[in-house]
Design a protein with these regions (language model features):
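RNA substrate-binding interface of SAM-dependent RNA methyltransferases
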Residues: 28-117
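Short, solvent-exposed amphipathic alpha-helical segments in soluble enzyme
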Residues: 54-58, 134-137, 158-161, 185
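Glycine- and other small-residue-rich loops at beta-strand/loop junctions that grip anionic moieties
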Residues: 40-41, 148, 173, 177
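N-terminal positively charged helical leader segments and presequences
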Residues: 1-28
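A short acidic, often aromatic-flanked loop/helix-cap motif at beta-alpha or helix-coil junctions
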Residues: 104-110, 126-128, 174-175
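Active-site/ligand-binding-proximal alpha/beta "capping" segment
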Residues: 118-157, 164-169
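Structured adenosyl-cofactor binding patch, chiefly the S-adenosyl-L-methionine
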Residues: 153-194
Length: 194
């Protein structure tokens, strides 16, 4: 999980606490992936576990729990999430394990990430298309998913002031947070990274 590739090696010798080997060939090159972050309002444990597992399998490189006005679950067990991320990385044969940040307020997230490319799950927009031209190649992509009950009006206004923001409606139905996250990451991966 060092992001440098995968190698095959021949063991030359084994002694107490030491294994000497010779690399014979490279099996996989370093992953050359665009960074995809998932900023999300924490949700109930079972649903959060599913969201983290599937988002890891889909290629998310960083998870950022966001505390909003309407966040119900305010404590996140980072150790539990790290275990899920490792298991999902192994299952999906990833070379790099995603990072998980400590929970941060939406206000601080916006302040720290003014130039970030943010694709915002927005129930109030008519936009159902991603435009590659609005995405800066210099910065990571961040999928931003709101809490149960959505962002407050004030929070939505703050989000929409971000420099590289794309509000996106993915469905006419109101989706659960974990469904919205998985759907948005799939859409981003397919449309912008292919």
């Amino acid at each position: 999980f060092n992001h440098r590739g995968e190698w095959e090696a021949k063991i030359n010798s084994i002694s107490k606490g030491v294994v000497e080997f010779c690399v014979t060939k490279q099996l996989r090159q370093k992953e050359n992936l665009k960074e995809i972050w998932l900023a999300f309002s924490p949700i109930k444990l079972n649903y959060l576990n599913i969201m983290i597992q599937k988002a890891t399998e889909l290629g998310v490189t960083k998870f950022i729990p966001i505390i909003t006005d309407r966040t119900i679950v305010r404590k996140v067990n980072l150790n539990r999430l790290e275990k899920i991320v490792v298991e999902s990385s192994e299952q999906s044969n990833r070379l790099k394990i995603p990072t998980i940040e400590k929970a941060i307020s939406l206000e601080n997230f916006i302040e720290k990430n003014k130039d970030l490319n943010v694709i915002f799950g927005d129930l109030n927009t008519d936009n159902m298309n991603l435009n590659k031209n609005k995405i800066s190649d210099k910065n990571p992509l961040c999928v931003l998913i709101g809490p149960e009950g959505d962002f407050s009006v004030k929070e939505r206004e703050s989000i929409l002031k971000l420099k590289n923001i794309i509000p996106l409606k993915i469905n006419d139905n109101i989706l659960r947070s974990e469904t919205a996250a998985i759907s948005m990451i799939s859409i981003v991966s397919f449309n912008l990274l292919s």
